[in-house]
Structures are given as structure tokens and as C-alpha cells.
């Protein structure tokens, strides 16, 4: 640990004083830029943030529109900065990249970019990069309520653009600095507006003051409560995808991800703990963190600010904004500043002020640029050697190619392909049928990913098991493979499969009605992940649909076609629309969802049940309520909200937990309770939920909500799984307590499970073997009803990630999904979030089934 021990209290008090009285721009510049010695140090034509905004930085929270306007103002007054809008957030706020470099570099920026790109091409010599500028990426406020860094972004950009110092001019000649000034504008404005709304004058430092205590969902996450710092690999959010596209245009040499942590901490920067390093990443990459750390330490030493390194934070997973660049030959760094969460707050170090937190972030940012310029040659060598070593590492792998794809699920196949292309991974079409590891893949519906490629390490991250690391104390998830989560068939081949042409863009969705106007019915195979979207669109237009609870084969215009259990049947008779109007409605849903609709001329099947069978059941139109508010796990309920909004296009009501006993529940067919604490729900609300379930409602719970539902007798008759073992009361070292507690955490493990594919909740799941994400310690006993345990974790499970032996024994054989029939309704209990982080499509389709088929899953009804 490196811990600088100069007294920090006088600096905090000085910053607190600065809050209480207006400061001239010159005085504020002296506070944030103590290295600038006089007023002539800056170009007077370039406005300071204070001059433009009308208030001193740190005296209030800057809204995103103001931040955007300031960066645009800088571009009006200087030829050293260009501002590009690369996208918009879900709430419509601009996403920016600001490029800061010397004017002469801007004049040849594309030439510089192309020259720099030779570093990531193993076939190009190191000399091809020449003396091109080093590329630095500064990413701010990915967690919206870690607010100091976006304020620091304005000051850092101002300094680089306006400083007249010879050193700064050298930096701009030898560096291209990319600013992502607010990666999460929706969350940041949520936090900024709260802090501004509850600010007092004079400011209150009481940690219990409302200014410091954000309500649900807080500003950490984006509009859909996504943790964007864990979305760099999955890229589920439109906030994430544009910046990754820019990342791959530039491949920065250094990337800093600015964060905040608890108020009683100091400042953290890497190197990270050696036990948290990925074996996929060359040791030289991690060693360079130590080189860059010298410049961060120097910057904070000059301020007398406390800091530490080498503790706490993982550094092995490409899901993070500081580790994703490590997987591309850059030096990625997480920095963490103790957060004031308001203008001033009491801490163990004294009064912690907003300006003080901002100043540390400015110092680290400028120290990063200084370090990158000074170490440019070594950084170029590092990146060149990284991609060359990727080919050598790939050659040593037993698996030579990965194949993926499912002819019956083009939607998820296409989605996984799109993700790979976003990461610049080489993918080729499968031009001949192959069987790999017992799985069959057809030409035209599957793809090949060669392992021998420059992006090998990212290929491994997506398809292979997360390699074990030395540590067993984790900050976040312990496994991150994407392919198992998608639920699409994939396999690794020990022999190289060449494949056909390289894929440069995903194919367009082939949504259409095949065969013209139907005389009897239309049918959609439920195995296509987008079938649910088509169903929601049809029901939204008043079209009634049915679901076949058993497979059938029938004649179509394309010949005999087999449909899996769960497939949709839309009869022509009895609809509010007829003839051409019904055809156009069905065709519109097919085009929008990208699914194929078959035309049926008869209700008689070639094989399996006929279309008039009791096994072809009428579907009710779902009316869904999502419970979200204080106590609810925001990221979990946000994933359900995202699934309904963005995947199904199905509207949902958002209820506060305290509303459950006050609003009429009978309007809802489905209520979803994600993980969280529901102890605040009173007995009146519990009784209302019980009556609603008994009358035919379907209550969907997961994680701690499932535990709560069992304890409240909402899922009467069900039992929790093995309780955690009693604590070992033998004597332990005081200093080991955090590590011991962390070892027993369950945090993001991929486990193998068995799924009953004949159950309505599992319709569309292609195989009995299912990967599930285990994220908590809740376990469920299999149901006493033999037909009601839908998913059960294997005994023993195959584990991808770290899971202690004690926890392996606890989860083995437990139920992961079961149905508890209660009167005319039911409670659908998941042990974990089935839509985890918005990319677990292999299990979020179980939640989709619970929404559409929830009234049809009780054993007596299903076999009635």
C-alpha cells in the first residue's frame, strides 16, 4: 500500500471556506491549478468554467446541458478542441467526445489516427507508428452520482486548451486527449438535480441531511438503472455502444476511469492487487500501471492529498471501463475519490468539500497526460507487443475455432454476431454443416470465430470460461463469459474451421409473412427470441393469439414445418380484423420483430396436436406492474423494465412498494418483485397481494423477494434451501475479517442447471442444459409438486467463476425456478435475477414466459 501522510485537514477547511464566499475566477484558478503561477498563465480569450456558468466550480452541481454547452463554448474559442456528438442517452441527452490536441494535429487528425492504428495490427512493424502522438482517454462520471469527475472534466479541458505553459504546449503536440465528459448523463442529472434542490446556504455537512441522501434509484445508474461501468463487454445500452465505437477508432494507450467512493476514504489509483490480475493479460501491462502511478502520486503529493494503491478493486474483467482497455494493449486505470455527495460533508478526515474532490480529479487527469507523454515510447511498445503476443497465446490454445448459431433462433444469433462485430472481432460465415462437441450447426444459420486473431483475448472472454485468478476476494462478478448467458448454441472446436467470407455487418432481420394471406391461421415459432415482441405487438392491436403447449408439424407454403412447444397460433376466425387488414397487422408485427410468420391453410397437423386441441391455449394480454422504490434492488428491477420496454415493447406500470396495499391490484395480470428488502411492506399490502394471487394473479419474485414471499406465506408450502452454516466462532485475526466475509460471498457465478423444456415457463429454451447466473446466497428447495420445479441446479454444478466449497454444496441440487400454485393464481419464484445485467437472454426468456403464460402454468390447469 502506498499511503501519503501529509495533513489533509487544512486543505479541506480551506476548500470549505471557499464554498462560503464568492471567489474571483483568478482565485479559483489558483485553487484548482496551483502550478499556474500568475494571471497570464492562461489565454484570456478562453472562458473559464466559472465565467461561462456564472458560479464557481464546486459551489453547485453542473447540469449536463450546461456541461455540453461549456465544451461547445471551448470549441468556439479555441482551435485545440473539437466536440463531437456520438449519440444520445435514453432520456435524450447528448453523448459527447471532445478531442483536445494541438491545432496542427487537428489539421491531420485522420492521418494520426490511421498511423496510430498500426500499433494494433500485428502484421505492421512498430516503426509504422513513428512519432505519432500518444492517445489518452479520460472517462468521467460513468456512475452518475460520482459527480466530482464531470466538474473536473471541464476544468481539465480548460487547462489544456487555455494554458500558455511550454509544458502544456508540448503535451498537445505529443498527445491526442479524448474526453468523455459524462458517460452517464441521465444518472448524473438525477444526482445533480437532487443535490442542487436540497442544498442549503450555508451548506449542511451533516451526513443525514437530505442533500447527502439520495432516494431510489439514486444517480449511480442510467435511465434503466444499468451500471454502465459493467457494460463495456455486453454493450446492452445505447449509452455504451457509441463510445466503444470511438474507442475502436482510436485504441487509446492510456484510459482513466474516474470514480468516487465512500466519504471516509481518501483517493485510490492503480496498480491493483496482483491477486486480481487476469492470466490473459501480459504481466507487462500491469507493470506499466506502476509506471503511470508515479505521475498520479506526484500530482497528489503536490496537493498534500492522501491516497493509496494496491487494494480493493478487481482488475481481471473486461466488463469495466478501466479493464476493457487492458484487453487492447492500453494501460487502463481506475481512480476513486472519496465523495462529498453534496457540497460539504463530515468525514473521519474532517470536512470533505466538493471543490476538494474536484481538485484531486483534475490533478490526476493532468498527471495522466504528463505521464502518457513522457512514457509514450514505452506505451507504444506495450500496445504493439500486446497484439503480437495475442497471436502467440492463441496458438497455444486447445480450441482453434468457436462456432455459434441456431437456425430456430435467428434473433439471438444475430444479436450475438452484432456484439462480436462491435468489439472488432473477426467472424466468418459457416459455409458447411458441422457437428462440434455433439452440437450440430447448419450452413447459413451459424458463424465461425477463429481463435487465431488479434482480438483473441476478447474472443476468449466472450466464449470461454473465465480463467481462474490467484485471489478469492472479489469486488464484483467472478465470471463474465457472454456466450453462455445468451443461450445460443455454441461450441469450441479443437480443429480449425475455416469458414467462408468475413462478416462485416449483421444481416437485416428477415421479418415477413411467408405465403400471403392465410385462410385458416398464422403461426410463429416460439424458439425465436423475438417471438415475444411480435406477440406483444399483435395483442396491442387487439389480435387474439393462442399457444401450442405441445409441438406440432403442419403444412405451410414452404412445405411441412415443425413448431416447438409454445409456438403461437393466430386463428383467422374470431378476430376483430379480417382478410387484408389482419394480414397487414400480422406482417407489420413480423417486420418490426424480425420474425418469420407461416401461413396455415388447415387446422389438421401432420404430426402432434391439431390446432383446435385443448393443448392450444388462448393467451391473455398481460398487464404488468413492476415494483420499484426504496428498498428495491434498482439494477435488478431495471433489467425487467428494460426487457419490457426495449425487447418486448410492452408497457408496464411502475409501482412504489408502499402502493401495493392502496391501489387496486386486479387490473394487473403480473406483478414483479425483484431482489431487495420488503420489510417496509405492511400486513395490509401482504394481504392484498395474497387475495390478488388467489384470484388468479401471477406474482413473479426473485432472490431476496422469493425468500420474502415464502416467509410471508405468499408462496405457501414452498421452502427455502439449505441455510448458511453457522458462523465459525473460533478465534480469527482481526485484519482478516473483510477477506473472510468476501470469500463466502456469492457474486456472479455461471452454474450449470437442468431445465424442464416441456414446462410453459421454459418454452423456447432449446436444450435441457441451461447456464444460470448465481448472484446471491438465496437457495430454494425443489417443489413438493413434481411438475413445478422448472430449473434445478446440477449436482454437482459446473462452475465458471469463484464459488467456495461451502457455497457449492449449498447450491447443488437446489431449485433455481419453480412455480407455487396458490388458488387460481401462482407465485413464480426465481432464486436470482433472470435478466441479470440485461444480457442473460438464455434466462430472461423464462421471465418473458412468466409474463405471457403466467396464468397457464399451474399443474392442474396445464393438464386440465
Please provide the spans of the model-predicted regions.
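Carboxylate/His-rich catalytic cores and anion/metal-binding grooves
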Residues: 157-160, 174-202
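Bacterial N-terminal signal peptides
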Residues: 10-20
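Intrinsic-disorder/low-complexity accessory segments
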Residues: 28-176, 224, 230-231, 236-242, ...
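Aromatic- and acidic-residue-enriched carbohydrate-binding clefts of CAZyme catalytic domains
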Residues: 208-226
